Amino acid sequence: VTKGTSGEWRFWYDLNKGTLLAAALFVVMFVIYVSNHPAGFTPNVVQTASNKAILLAFVAMAQCLVVITAGIDLSAGMVLVLCNCLASWLVVGTPMQTAFGIVAVLVAGLACGTLNGLIIIFGRLQPIVTTIATSGIFFGLALLLRPTPGGSVNEALADVFTSKLFGIFPTSLVVLAATILLVWVPFSRSVYGRAAYAAGSAENAAYMSGMPLKRAKLTAYALAGLLSAMGGLYLTFYSYTGEAAFASGNAYTLYSIAAVVLGGVSLAGGKGSAVGAVFGALAFRTIGDLLFVFDLDPLWQPLFQGIVLMLAIGVGSIGLARVRNRLEWFQ
Protein backbone atom coordinates (compact mmCIF):
# COMPACT_ATOMS: atom_id res chain seq x y z
CA VAL A 1 0.00 0.00 0.00
CA THR A 2 1.49 3.33 -1.05
CA LYS A 3 1.71 6.34 1.20
CA GLY A 4 -0.92 8.15 -0.88
CA THR A 5 -3.33 5.24 -0.71
CA SER A 6 -2.78 4.92 3.04
CA GLY A 7 -3.56 8.61 3.47
CA GLU A 8 -6.73 8.28 1.42
CA TRP A 9 -7.91 5.35 3.53
CA ARG A 10 -7.15 7.26 6.72
CA PHE A 11 -9.10 10.26 5.44
CA TRP A 12 -12.02 8.02 4.44
CA TYR A 13 -11.96 6.33 7.84
CA ASP A 14 -11.91 9.63 9.74
CA LEU A 15 -14.79 10.87 7.59
CA ASN A 16 -16.92 7.75 8.14
CA LYS A 17 -15.80 6.72 11.61
CA GLY A 18 -19.14 7.55 13.21
CA THR A 19 -21.07 5.56 10.61
CA LEU A 20 -18.76 2.56 11.00
CA LEU A 21 -19.08 2.66 14.79
CA ALA A 22 -22.89 2.81 14.60
CA ALA A 23 -22.96 -0.03 12.07
CA ALA A 24 -20.68 -2.19 14.21
CA LEU A 25 -22.75 -1.48 17.32
CA PHE A 26 -25.96 -2.41 15.51
CA VAL A 27 -24.50 -5.64 14.11
CA VAL A 28 -23.25 -6.73 17.55
CA MET A 29 -26.56 -5.92 19.24
CA PHE A 30 -28.64 -7.56 16.51
CA VAL A 31 -26.53 -10.73 16.57
CA ILE A 32 -27.07 -10.93 20.34
CA TYR A 33 -30.80 -10.36 19.79
CA VAL A 34 -31.34 -13.05 17.16
CA SER A 35 -29.03 -15.48 18.98
CA ASN A 36 -31.26 -15.31 22.04
CA HIS A 37 -34.61 -15.05 20.25
CA PRO A 38 -36.80 -18.16 20.73
CA ALA A 39 -37.31 -18.41 16.96
CA GLY A 40 -33.67 -17.70 16.12
CA PHE A 41 -32.47 -15.96 12.96
CA THR A 42 -35.50 -16.34 10.70
CA PRO A 43 -37.05 -14.12 7.99
CA ASN A 44 -40.06 -13.45 10.24
CA VAL A 45 -37.88 -12.22 13.12
CA VAL A 46 -35.92 -9.92 10.81
CA GLN A 47 -39.15 -8.70 9.18
CA THR A 48 -40.74 -7.74 12.50
CA ALA A 49 -37.62 -5.96 13.71
CA SER A 50 -37.27 -4.11 10.40
CA ASN A 51 -40.86 -2.91 10.32
CA LYS A 52 -40.51 -1.41 13.80
CA ALA A 53 -37.07 0.11 13.21
CA ILE A 54 -37.81 1.75 9.87
CA LEU A 55 -40.09 4.33 11.50
CA LEU A 56 -37.26 5.76 13.59
CA ALA A 57 -34.83 5.36 10.67
CA PHE A 58 -36.89 7.70 8.48
CA VAL A 59 -37.17 10.34 11.21
CA ALA A 60 -33.45 10.00 12.00
CA MET A 61 -32.63 10.65 8.33
CA ALA A 62 -34.86 13.71 8.46
CA GLN A 63 -33.14 14.96 11.60
CA CYS A 64 -29.72 14.34 10.07
CA LEU A 65 -30.40 16.59 7.07
CA VAL A 66 -31.28 19.48 9.36
CA VAL A 67 -28.52 18.89 11.92
CA ILE A 68 -25.88 18.95 9.17
CA THR A 69 -26.83 22.60 8.56
CA ALA A 70 -26.29 23.31 12.30
CA GLY A 71 -30.05 23.32 12.87
CA ILE A 72 -32.42 21.02 14.70
CA ASP A 73 -35.97 19.88 13.95
CA LEU A 74 -38.13 19.41 17.03
CA SER A 75 -41.20 19.00 14.84
CA ALA A 76 -40.04 15.84 13.03
CA GLY A 77 -42.04 13.50 15.26
CA MET A 78 -45.18 15.60 14.93
CA VAL A 79 -44.88 15.62 11.14
CA LEU A 80 -44.81 11.83 11.36
CA VAL A 81 -47.93 11.85 13.57
CA LEU A 82 -49.75 14.32 11.29
CA CYS A 83 -48.97 12.28 8.17
CA ASN A 84 -50.02 9.09 9.95
CA CYS A 85 -53.42 10.65 10.67
CA LEU A 86 -53.68 12.03 7.14
CA ALA A 87 -52.80 8.65 5.61
CA SER A 88 -55.52 6.96 7.68
CA TRP A 89 -58.02 9.12 5.79
CA LEU A 90 -56.53 9.20 2.30
CA VAL A 91 -54.61 5.96 1.59
CA VAL A 92 -57.75 3.91 1.00
CA GLY A 93 -60.07 2.91 -1.82
CA THR A 94 -59.20 2.06 -5.40
CA PRO A 95 -55.58 1.86 -6.62
CA MET A 96 -55.91 5.34 -8.14
CA GLN A 97 -57.34 6.79 -4.93
CA THR A 98 -54.64 5.07 -2.88
CA ALA A 99 -51.90 6.44 -5.14
CA PHE A 100 -53.36 9.93 -4.84
CA GLY A 101 -53.48 9.53 -1.06
CA ILE A 102 -49.81 8.52 -0.87
CA VAL A 103 -48.78 11.51 -2.99
CA ALA A 104 -50.93 13.82 -0.85
CA VAL A 105 -49.33 12.54 2.37
CA LEU A 106 -45.80 13.00 1.01
CA VAL A 107 -46.63 16.48 -0.31
CA ALA A 108 -48.06 17.38 3.11
CA GLY A 109 -44.79 16.34 4.77
CA LEU A 110 -42.82 18.28 2.17
CA ALA A 111 -44.98 21.34 2.87
CA CYS A 112 -44.40 21.03 6.64
CA GLY A 113 -40.65 20.90 6.15
CA THR A 114 -40.73 23.78 3.67
CA LEU A 115 -42.72 25.87 6.16
CA ASN A 116 -40.06 25.26 8.80
CA GLY A 117 -37.33 26.25 6.37
CA LEU A 118 -39.06 29.42 5.19
CA ILE A 119 -39.68 30.66 8.73
CA ILE A 120 -36.12 29.91 9.85
CA ILE A 121 -34.40 31.36 6.77
CA PHE A 122 -36.53 34.39 5.93
CA GLY A 123 -38.01 34.99 9.38
CA ARG A 124 -34.49 34.68 10.84
CA LEU A 125 -35.72 32.72 13.84
CA GLN A 126 -33.77 30.05 15.68
CA PRO A 127 -34.53 26.49 14.46
CA ILE A 128 -35.27 25.25 17.98
CA VAL A 129 -37.88 27.99 18.59
CA THR A 130 -39.44 27.67 15.15
CA THR A 131 -39.80 23.90 15.20
CA ILE A 132 -41.21 23.87 18.73
CA ALA A 133 -43.91 26.27 17.52
CA THR A 134 -44.66 24.38 14.31
CA SER A 135 -44.73 21.06 16.14
CA GLY A 136 -47.69 22.41 18.13
CA ILE A 137 -49.41 23.43 14.89
CA PHE A 138 -48.81 20.04 13.29
CA PHE A 139 -50.09 18.20 16.35
CA GLY A 140 -53.18 20.42 16.43
CA LEU A 141 -53.92 19.52 12.81
CA ALA A 142 -53.41 15.84 13.64
CA LEU A 143 -55.93 16.15 16.47
CA LEU A 144 -58.45 17.73 14.11
CA LEU A 145 -58.02 14.80 11.73
CA ARG A 146 -58.03 12.09 14.40
CA PRO A 147 -59.41 13.22 17.78
CA THR A 148 -59.63 9.51 18.59
CA PRO A 149 -57.66 6.60 17.09
CA GLY A 150 -59.28 5.25 13.95
CA GLY A 151 -59.32 5.17 10.18
CA SER A 152 -57.94 2.54 7.87
CA VAL A 153 -55.49 1.96 5.06
CA ASN A 154 -55.34 -0.06 1.86
CA GLU A 155 -54.50 -3.37 3.53
CA ALA A 156 -53.24 -5.06 0.37
CA LEU A 157 -50.71 -2.27 -0.17
CA ALA A 158 -49.79 -2.20 3.53
CA ASP A 159 -49.12 -5.93 3.44
CA VAL A 160 -46.81 -5.49 0.44
CA PHE A 161 -44.73 -2.79 2.14
CA THR A 162 -44.48 -4.63 5.45
CA SER A 163 -43.95 -8.15 4.11
CA LYS A 164 -40.91 -10.00 2.76
CA LEU A 165 -39.49 -9.77 -0.75
CA PHE A 166 -39.38 -13.27 -2.30
CA GLY A 167 -40.40 -14.54 1.13
CA ILE A 168 -36.96 -13.79 2.56
CA PHE A 169 -35.87 -10.14 2.65
CA PRO A 170 -37.97 -7.46 4.43
CA THR A 171 -39.56 -5.06 1.96
CA SER A 172 -39.16 -2.25 4.49
CA LEU A 173 -35.36 -2.51 4.25
CA VAL A 174 -35.58 -2.35 0.45
CA VAL A 175 -37.66 0.83 0.73
CA LEU A 176 -35.18 2.27 3.24
CA ALA A 177 -32.21 1.51 0.96
CA ALA A 178 -34.06 2.99 -2.03
CA THR A 179 -34.79 6.15 -0.03
CA ILE A 180 -31.12 6.54 0.84
CA LEU A 181 -30.16 6.12 -2.83
CA LEU A 182 -32.89 8.40 -4.19
CA VAL A 183 -32.93 11.13 -1.54
CA TRP A 184 -29.72 11.20 0.51
CA VAL A 185 -27.12 10.31 -2.14
CA PRO A 186 -28.26 12.90 -4.74
CA PHE A 187 -28.63 15.58 -2.06
CA SER A 188 -25.25 14.97 -0.42
CA ARG A 189 -23.46 15.05 -3.77
CA SER A 190 -25.27 18.11 -5.11
CA VAL A 191 -24.30 21.76 -4.81
CA TYR A 192 -27.01 22.18 -2.17
CA GLY A 193 -25.66 19.24 -0.20
CA ARG A 194 -22.13 20.65 -0.15
CA ALA A 195 -23.56 24.03 0.82
CA ALA A 196 -25.51 22.39 3.66
CA TYR A 197 -22.30 20.90 5.04
CA ALA A 198 -20.57 24.25 4.63
CA ALA A 199 -23.40 26.02 6.46
CA GLY A 200 -22.89 23.70 9.40
CA SER A 201 -19.11 23.88 9.56
CA ALA A 202 -18.24 27.46 8.53
CA GLU A 203 -21.31 29.45 7.53
CA ASN A 204 -19.62 32.85 7.29
CA ALA A 205 -16.87 31.54 5.05
CA ALA A 206 -19.41 29.69 2.91
CA TYR A 207 -21.48 32.86 2.57
CA MET A 208 -18.45 34.89 1.53
CA SER A 209 -17.60 32.29 -1.11
CA GLY A 210 -21.04 32.65 -2.67
CA MET A 211 -22.49 29.24 -1.83
CA PRO A 212 -26.32 28.95 -2.05
CA LEU A 213 -26.84 28.63 1.70
CA LYS A 214 -30.49 29.69 1.82
CA ARG A 215 -31.55 27.29 -0.88
CA ALA A 216 -29.46 24.52 0.69
CA LYS A 217 -31.09 24.99 4.08
CA LEU A 218 -34.56 25.19 2.55
CA THR A 219 -33.92 21.98 0.62
CA ALA A 220 -32.67 20.25 3.77
CA TYR A 221 -35.77 21.21 5.78
CA ALA A 222 -38.13 20.33 2.91
CA LEU A 223 -36.56 16.89 2.46
CA ALA A 224 -36.67 16.40 6.23
CA GLY A 225 -40.42 16.91 6.11
CA LEU A 226 -40.69 14.45 3.23
CA LEU A 227 -38.74 11.78 5.12
CA SER A 228 -40.83 12.26 8.26
CA ALA A 229 -43.93 11.86 6.09
CA MET A 230 -42.57 8.55 4.84
CA GLY A 231 -42.23 7.50 8.46
CA GLY A 232 -45.85 8.48 9.08
CA LEU A 233 -46.96 6.57 6.00
CA TYR A 234 -45.12 3.47 7.16
CA LEU A 235 -46.64 3.81 10.63
CA THR A 236 -50.06 3.66 8.98
CA PHE A 237 -49.04 0.60 6.97
CA TYR A 238 -47.79 -1.07 10.14
CA SER A 239 -50.70 -0.20 12.46
CA TYR A 240 -53.60 0.00 9.92
CA THR A 241 -54.83 3.09 11.74
CA GLY A 242 -54.14 6.73 12.56
CA GLU A 243 -53.68 8.30 15.97
CA ALA A 244 -52.74 11.79 17.16
CA ALA A 245 -50.42 10.51 19.87
CA PHE A 246 -48.58 13.41 21.53
CA ALA A 247 -46.23 11.16 23.50
CA SER A 248 -45.37 9.14 20.41
CA GLY A 249 -44.52 12.26 18.39
CA ASN A 250 -42.26 13.62 21.10
CA ALA A 251 -40.58 10.24 21.53
CA TYR A 252 -39.74 9.97 17.83
CA THR A 253 -38.30 13.49 17.88
CA LEU A 254 -36.07 12.83 20.89
CA TYR A 255 -35.04 9.38 19.68
CA SER A 256 -34.16 10.81 16.26
CA ILE A 257 -31.74 13.24 17.91
CA ALA A 258 -30.23 10.38 19.89
CA ALA A 259 -29.96 8.30 16.70
CA VAL A 260 -28.06 10.97 14.77
CA VAL A 261 -25.63 11.40 17.67
CA LEU A 262 -25.21 7.63 17.88
CA GLY A 263 -24.63 7.61 14.11
CA GLY A 264 -21.72 10.02 14.32
CA VAL A 265 -23.53 13.17 13.18
CA SER A 266 -22.21 16.27 14.93
CA LEU A 267 -24.91 18.38 16.60
CA ALA A 268 -22.70 21.38 15.84
CA GLY A 269 -23.29 20.73 12.15
CA GLY A 270 -21.10 20.13 9.14
CA LYS A 271 -20.28 16.49 9.83
CA GLY A 272 -22.09 13.19 9.51
CA SER A 273 -24.12 11.06 7.16
CA ALA A 274 -27.72 9.92 6.89
CA VAL A 275 -26.38 6.38 6.57
CA GLY A 276 -24.81 6.75 10.00
CA ALA A 277 -28.08 8.16 11.34
CA VAL A 278 -29.94 5.12 9.99
CA PHE A 279 -27.53 2.72 11.68
CA GLY A 280 -27.85 4.79 14.84
CA ALA A 281 -31.63 4.41 14.64
CA LEU A 282 -31.38 0.66 14.05
CA ALA A 283 -29.02 0.26 17.01
CA PHE A 284 -31.19 2.44 19.24
CA ARG A 285 -34.31 0.47 18.32
CA THR A 286 -32.58 -2.87 18.92
CA ILE A 287 -32.16 -1.99 22.60
CA GLY A 288 -35.89 -2.56 23.12
CA ASP A 289 -35.69 -5.87 21.27
CA LEU A 290 -32.85 -7.00 23.54
CA LEU A 291 -34.94 -6.27 26.61
CA PHE A 292 -37.68 -8.46 25.12
CA VAL A 293 -35.50 -11.51 24.50
CA PHE A 294 -33.88 -11.24 27.94
CA ASP A 295 -37.34 -10.84 29.53
CA LEU A 296 -36.49 -7.53 31.23
CA ASP A 297 -39.03 -4.92 32.27
CA PRO A 298 -39.59 -2.35 29.45
CA LEU A 299 -39.15 0.36 32.10
CA TRP A 300 -35.41 -0.39 31.89
CA GLN A 301 -35.33 0.68 28.23
CA PRO A 302 -34.63 4.42 28.78
CA LEU A 303 -31.76 3.54 31.14
CA PHE A 304 -30.06 1.22 28.63
CA GLN A 305 -30.68 3.65 25.78
CA GLY A 306 -29.06 6.39 27.84
CA ILE A 307 -26.04 4.22 28.64
CA VAL A 308 -25.50 3.30 24.98
CA LEU A 309 -25.89 6.93 23.95
CA MET A 310 -23.43 8.15 26.58
CA LEU A 311 -20.88 5.54 25.48
CA ALA A 312 -21.24 6.65 21.87
CA ILE A 313 -20.85 10.31 22.81
CA GLY A 314 -17.86 9.40 24.97
CA VAL A 315 -16.09 7.68 22.08
CA GLY A 316 -16.73 10.71 19.87
CA SER A 317 -15.48 13.10 22.56
CA ILE A 318 -12.26 11.11 22.96
CA GLY A 319 -11.66 11.38 19.21
CA LEU A 320 -12.32 15.12 19.28
CA ALA A 321 -9.97 15.59 22.24
CA ARG A 322 -7.21 13.76 20.36
CA VAL A 323 -7.64 16.10 17.38
CA ARG A 324 -7.49 19.16 19.64
CA ASN A 325 -4.35 17.87 21.35
CA ARG A 326 -2.66 17.43 17.98
CA LEU A 327 -3.64 20.94 16.94
CA GLU A 328 -2.13 22.34 20.15
CA TRP A 329 1.27 20.99 19.07
CA PHE A 330 1.35 23.61 16.32
CA GLN A 331 0.47 26.56 18.56
Regions of interest found by a model, annotated:
Residues 28-34, 41-94, 118-124, 260, ...:
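Single transmembrane alpha-helix segments in multi-pass membrane proteins
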Residues 36-48, 143-144, 148, 187-193, ...:
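Inter-helical junctions in multi-pass inner-membrane proteins, predominant
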Residues 1-31, 181, 208, 212-215, ...:
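Cytosolic-side transmembrane-helix boundaries in multi-pass membrane proteins
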Residues 14, 127-190, 216-219, 238-249, ...:
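Transmembrane helix-bundle core of multi-pass membrane transporters
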Residues 19, 33-37, 163-198, 212-214, ...:
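Alpha-helical transmembrane segments of multi-pass integral membrane proteins
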Residues 228, 243-303:
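Transmembrane alpha-helical segments in multi-pass inner-membrane proteins
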